Amino acid sequence: ILDIFQYLFGMPQRLFAVIPFGKYNPFAVDDEDTIVMEYDTGMTASFILTTGEACCEERMEIIGTKARLLLEDNTLSITRFDDIEKYIKTEDVNSREHLHFTEEKIMYEKSAEPYTQLLEKFAQASLKHDEGCLVAKGAEGLHSLMLCAGAYYSACKGIRVDLPLDAVRYKELMDNLIEDEKNAPVM
């Protein structure tokens, strides 16, 4: 999911993450992720993922100054409103009472599991030696890995981190985590 996020919004410059490793499992795995990302443009983003809920809801919400997009299952809800920045500056109270907006819902057919499609296209590209089959170039994956590494580092150290992350510090952290895991009692 981070790869789709990064593909849509680009790389943040900073992030802070909370990851309770092993919350739902007896081993160190990222069962939940809460990541707050910051961009030099002033944009912020929240990324929340959990494997510990039965509802299996996939949802992406994008809120800007002119619209809100909400993607849930096979429905895209678009709420277009007057410019929020102007509304905030001119409205007497913090209320949406006088905010003018329109709403639209777009339903589409539910497609196959996205990762299945990505793997199929990767296999086609590999077999045909044709990058044109790919959804995105392989180098794009490095950005997702940097986000993941930054989130792990932030969560383990309890600090906000700048991106790109220092590879030497990240390797030291991973080496320590691997050693700790080797010495952890078996459950």
Regions found by a protein language model. Give the residues of each.
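A general structural signal for well-ordered alpha-helical segments in protein cores
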Residues: 1-2, 115-120, 148
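Rossmann-like dinucleotide-binding domain that binds NAD(P)(H)
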Residues: 1-44, 49-55, 61, 139
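Short, hydrophobic alpha-helical segments
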Residues: 9, 119-130, 149-156
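Short hydrophobic/aromatic-rich beta-strand segments that constitute the beta-sheet cores
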Residues: 17, 47, 71, 78-80, ...
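Short, solvent-exposed polar/charged micro-motifs at secondary-structure junctions
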Residues: 24-29, 57, 145-147, 171-176
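C-terminal glycine/acidic-rich active-site capping loop/insertion
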Residues: 34, 39, 66-139, 161, ...
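A short beta-strand motif that forms part of the nucleic acid-binding face
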Residues: 49-51, 64, 75, 167
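A contiguous, mid-protein "functional segment" used to position or interact
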Residues: 134-168
